[in-house]
Amino acid sequence: MVDNAADDGAHARTRESVPMITERLDGTRIAITGATGFLGTALVERFLRAVPGCELVLVVRAGKRTPARERVRREILRNDCFDRLRAELGDRFEAEMDRRIDVIEGDVSRDGLGLNDEGRAILKTCHTVVHSAAAVAFDSPLDSAVETNLLGPTRVAAAMREAGCTGHLIAVSTCYVAGARRGDAPEKVLPETPFATEADWRAEVAAARRLRSDTDAISRTVPKLAMFRKRARAELGGAGTPLLAAKTEKLREDWVRNELVEAGRARAASLGWPDAYAYTKALGERALLETRDGVPVTTVRPSIIESAMAEPRPGWIRGFRMAEPVIISYARGLLKEFPGIPEGVVDVIPVDMVVAAIIAVAAAGPDPSGPTVYQVASGARQPLRYREMVTTIREWFTEHPLYDKEGQPILVPEWSFPGRGRVEQQLRRATNLLKRGEKLIAALPVRGSQAEIVSDLEVLHIVIRHVICIPPKNHIAKCGAPFHGRQEFFRCDIFSA
C-alpha cells in the first residue's frame, strides 16, 4: 500500500507576486501529444479557452484514410468538450481554431516521432511540449505498452533535440509508478525514492520486442492455425471461404494480443507493479532521465483521471475510464458485487484538476536545478473511501434505475465487498451465459437481442480486466501548483472537489 503524500515544502516557488498564468503563457507556442485522448482533449480545450494568447501545435498520428488535420477536426474540435468555447466564439470558432492550431503528423511509437522536415521546423518553434500520449489501459499488450509508455517520452525528448527545440518538456506519468509498495512516495524523481527499480529498461524493451516476434511466429504454426480455423468454423458454420478466412485471422490476432497482455501482467507483477501500465510508466520516467541530454523536464503524476468537476462542464468525460464500466455493469444487473476493502481509498482525480496543474506547470517553466515532479491526486487531502463510493452509487441507481427491455426498473443489489476470486467467478459465469445466448441467436442481424448481448459482453470483458488488474489502494498525493493566478480557470485545490 503506497501513500503518495507530497512534501509540503517541495514547491516553495509559489508566490503571490508571480505573474498570472495567462500573462506568463501569452505569446507562447505549446506542442501536445495525445491530443485525441481524454486528457489531451480537455487540455487543448482549456488552453484555447483560458489562455487566449497562446498557440497550439498538435502532434497527431494520421489514420489509415484520415489525415492528421482531419482527425483533429473530427475527434477533438467536434467533441462536446468544445461546446462552451464554440458558443463563446460563435461564427468565429472555425477561423479561430485554424489561426491558433498547427497540426503536424507524428507518432510517439516511432523514432523521431516520424516527423518530416516541416514537422521538425514547426516543433522547433515551441516553448513547451506536453507529452500526454499513452497506452492507458491496465491490460495493454506488453509490446505496445513498452513502445508507447516506456519509449514514448524518450522519443519526444530526442525529437525536440533533433528539431533544435529548446523548450520545456512536461511528461505526464502516473502516481502508480511506485508500484505495490508500502510507504510515502514523495514528489521526487524515482531514483531519489525508496521505490527505484534496478530493472534495465533497455533489456526490458529488447525482451518485449522479442516476445512479440516469438508469439506471432507461434501463432502461425500449423497446429495453431488449425486450431483457429476449427474455432472459426464452429462459430460460423457453413460460411464461405472469405468469411472463414477473416474470422480465422481475427482469432489468431486475438490470441497473440491475449498472450502479450498476460506477459505484461506477469512481468509487471514480478517486478512489483500491479499492471503493465504502471510498470512501463515507471521505466519510462527512468529512461527519460537517463537520455534527456539537456532537455528540461518536469513530470506530472496524476492518479486515476475521471470526469470533470467543473471544466468545461461538470461531469464531462470521454470514453470508458476506470470506474464507468464497473458502475454501468452494476446498474445493468450484470455485476452483483466488486472486490475491495471498504475503508480503502479510491484515488481518483477530476480531469480538469489535472489540466489545471499541467497548465500551471507550463507557466512556471522548468526548475533550473533539474527535473522535478508534481503529483496530482486526491487521497491525501480528500480521500474517497470505497464504502462511500459504493453507497453513493447504490443510492443513485435506487432512485434513478436503469430499465430492462421489458420497461421494468433494474434493482441493484447490496455489495458485500468479497474477495477478487469470487467476483471473477461471478463475472465469468455471466459471460458464459451471454455467450451461449449469443450463439443461439447468431443468425439474427446485429440489432435487438443480439446487439444487447454484444453490448453486455463488451462491458463484462472490460470489468473482468479491471477485476484482474485492480491497482493498489491508497495511492495518495497532493497537487502542488506553482501559481495562484486566474483561480476560476486554474483551480486545482483538492479540498474544492
Regions found by a protein language model. Give the residues of each.
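N-terminal Rossmann/SDR dinucleotide-binding element
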Residues: 2-135, 142-147, 153-154, 159-168, ...
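A catalytic-pocket lid/entrance helix-loop region that shapes and gates access to the active site
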Residues: 76-78, 182-216, 313-334, 338, ...
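A conserved pocket-lining segment of Rossmann-fold NAD(P)-dependent short-chain dehydrogenase/reductase
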Residues: 141, 242, 258-275, 303, ...
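Conserved cofactor-binding/catalytic machinery of classical short-chain dehydrogenase/reductase
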Residues: 151-155, 283-284, 350
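Conserved beta-loop-beta element that borders a ligand/cofactor-binding pocket
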Residues: 222-262, 269-276, 282-315, 367-373
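Mid/C-terminal beta-alpha module of Rossmann-like enzyme folds, strongest
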Residues: 361-471, 477
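N-terminal low-complexity segments that are often proline-rich with Ser/Thr-Pro
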Residues: 466-496
